[in-house]
């Protein structure tokens, strides 16, 4: 199909300071912050860790922001990954993304992901797992970072750690998770 040309620009979710500015909360000039101001900042930070930094969801209640972020995730999976890279096995892609987002801060190996897919009776080759993870990173949904080591061999041999582009996406795809 013919499509028009597009200019791409990378827009990332708000940082905590940007969320505070968006919500009209002034960042204190002196640290440490004490008293009521400290309590307010802690509450805002807890909310930021739950909701994330996508600007549109900042004003929503939990049920609505969760559904909105789930929709963002689904659109990114279908358009930015599956359609763009002609991935036919969307079930495997959904499983991989949810598994990676549920493993934030943990080590994730392609072998373990492949075994999990096989256990779920989702037919996918190990090379497809590698390529789908690369596409997920390309779409800025999650990042798999190597172990910090001076040895290149050690970096390559160890499983990578998973990180999400936004905290809210993690909460949106993990029902019942409070942290």
Regions found by a protein language model. Give the residues of each.
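Interdomain motor-coupling "hinge/lid" segment immediately C-terminal to the ATP-binding subdomain
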Residues: 1-106
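Accessory nucleic acid-recognition modules appended to NTPase machines
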Residues: 60-179
């Amino acid at each position: 199909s013919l499509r028009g040309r597009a200019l791409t620009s990378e827009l990332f979710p708000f940082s905590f300071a940007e969320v505070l500015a968006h919500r009209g909360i002034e960042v204190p000039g002196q640290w440490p912050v004490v008293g009521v101001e400290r309590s307010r900042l802690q509450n805002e930070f807890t909310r930021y860790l739950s909701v994330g930094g996508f600007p549109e969801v900042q004003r929503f209640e939990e049920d609505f922001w969760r559904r909105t972020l789930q929709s963002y995730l689904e659109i990114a999976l279908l358009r930015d990954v599956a359609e763009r890279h002609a991935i036919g096995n969307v079930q495997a892609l959904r499983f991989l993304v949810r598994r990676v987002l549920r493993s934030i801060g943990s080590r994730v190996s392609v072998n373990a992901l492949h075994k999990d897919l096989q256990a779920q009776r989702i037919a996918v080759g190990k090379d497809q797992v590698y390529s789908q993870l690369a596409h997920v990173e390309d779409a800025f949904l999650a990042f798999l970072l190597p172990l910090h080591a001076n040895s290149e061999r050690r970096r390559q041999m160890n499983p990578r750690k998973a990180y999400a582009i936004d905290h809210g996406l993690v909460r949106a795809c993990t029902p019942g998770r409070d942290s």
